Amino acid sequence: MGDRERNKKRLLELLRAPDTGNAHCADCGAADPDWASYKLGIFICLNCCGVHRNFPDISRVKSVRLDFWDDSIVEFMIHNGNLRVKAKFEARVPAFYYIPQANDCLVLKEQWIRAKYERREFMADGETISLPGNREGFLWKRGRDNSQFLRRKFVLLAREGLLKYFTKEQGKSPKAVISIKDLNATFQTEKIGHPHGLQITYRRDGHTRNLFVYHESGKEIVDWFNALRAARLQYLKMAFPELPESELVPFLTRNYLKQGFMEKTGPKQKEPFKKRWFALDCHERRLLYYKNPLDAFEQGQVFLGNKEQGYEAYEDLPKGIRGNRWKAGLTIVTPERRFVLTCPSEKEQQEWLESLRGVLSSPLTPLNRLTASTESGRSSR
């Protein structure tokens, strides 16, 4: 066996070795990484490899299976490995800092990788990282009633639990004052049409208000995202002092479980089917629907209780009802009414059913019960 095949075999064995963490990407956790940074000594996935290639001063990459590896580099990989390197570069990651997963957008992965290896923000011998307090800056915000993005000043007052934005740079009166209590932030790059697109949502007069923003700098928008998470953590610690920090972190921000177009009919189920954009918020157990994906407010919402309360989702349409263009139907049953929907494909239908049934089969939290009591009457729009 030549050096090439022998070292390839050693690397593949190292990928599968127990207690190394090598079986998953060191940066996003994707399974079965096929690439490695031989300058850092870690195994990474194809997507994260693309980020590493952009920073040759901190990382150099090779394919585990296709490139040649000499003995010294293989020994370096054996001496390091994912868990050892993560222990060094992720020694002090703040609880609020979002660690991207495999399906997250590129800007989150890029800034995570740069924060770790280029800026070395989380090493044990670095400066103490504290919760960010106030933050002020400019973001490009989409207009409520049009598609134009305009530069707006945003001010985060973490201790007061408030986010404000202003239409005038020197203005004293904010256009909106947003409570951190009801705020969520999620990257929606495809929907917004910008690689740094961030969607901020909050409750206003019983509705969900959507703000769509971006910044030209990837670092700036991710810093804003993590600052909002830090402010949320401060609020939750004060609101729930008896809960450990680890139980609060999952509630800092959340992604939609599923989004996409479906067609729906009205409450009488005789109205024409109309195309609507749906977003499933599993934490608040709400299915929101919009006329367009970038609308400022939802047209309506469905609170999703659980099976014991008479909620269910099933395949197909009620007898005698036919959809418009799309034939793959599903029906959501609530104590108040049925919601009859059609999906663009059977694949989408099954994905929606799986997501909806996952929510309906989970127990309600006290927050969910409060949401149900205050919003159940709003689902018929």
UniProtKB/Swiss-Prot annotation:
It is found in: Cytoplasm; Cell membrane. Residues 9-131 form the Arf-GAP domain. Transmembrane segments: none annotated. GO terms for molecular function: GTPase activator activity; inositol 1,3,4,5 tetrakisphosphate binding; phosphatidylinositol-3,4,5-trisphosphate binding; phosphatidylinositol-3,4-bisphosphate binding; phosphatidylinositol-4,5-bisphosphate binding; protein-macromolecule adaptor activity; zinc ion binding. Keywords: Cell membrane, Cytoplasm, GTPase activation, Membrane, Metal-binding, Repeat, Zinc, Zinc-finger. GTPase-activating protein for the ADP ribosylation factor family (Potential). Binds phosphatidylinositol 3,4,5-trisphosphate (PtdInsP3) and inositol 1,3,4,5-tetrakisphosphate (InsP4). Possesses a stoichiometry of two binding sites for InsP4 with identical affinity. A zinc finger (C4-type) spans 25-48. One of its GO terms (cellular component) is intracellular membrane-bounded organelle. This is Arf-GAP with dual PH domain-containing protein 2. GO terms for biological process: heart development.
